[in-house]
Amino acid sequence: MTADDVASIERAATDYIEAWLTGDADRMADCLHPDLTKRSIENDAISGRPSVDAMTHRDMVEATRAGRGMQLPRGYEVTIEDTFRNIATARVDSARYVDYLHIARFEDRWRIVSVLWEPQERE
């Protein structure tokens, strides 16, 4: 893992959160792998039991385009948690969410392939 790789991993994570906060759908689309799945654990509205809610690359780009993150405070912190050859895990702490990103190298690009997130505080 080179210093350039680490910088590229951090750039992918930074692009993700900054695109969300600014409504930049093109930037979001560029940092995500086309097969991305973004998941959260939500309580089912009927049963009250935990269930998995998932978004695709397309869902994420459209939510970004709609400005769903633009009303949030702009502060965030990106931490590279671990790296190994062609994969990495990063954590993004923002005012509202904690996101764990799995990032992988595809040829010379690092892209986010999966996200698991949860609100900082339950609503």
PLM regions and their residue ranges:
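Short, low-complexity N-terminal intrinsically disordered segments enriched in polar/charged residues
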Residues: 1-35, 46, 50-51
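Surface-exposed, charged secondary-structure patches
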Residues: 4-8, 37-97
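Enrichment for repetitive, rod-forming helical segments
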Residues: 23, 45-46, 98, 112
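Amphipathic alpha-helical interaction segments
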Residues: 24-29, 65-68, 118
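Residue-level "edge-of-site" marker
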Residues: 33, 41, 116-118
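Short secondary-structure capping/turn micro-motifs that flank functional sites
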Residues: 36-37, 121
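Short beta-strand edge/turn micro-motifs at domain boundaries
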Residues: 89-91, 98-123
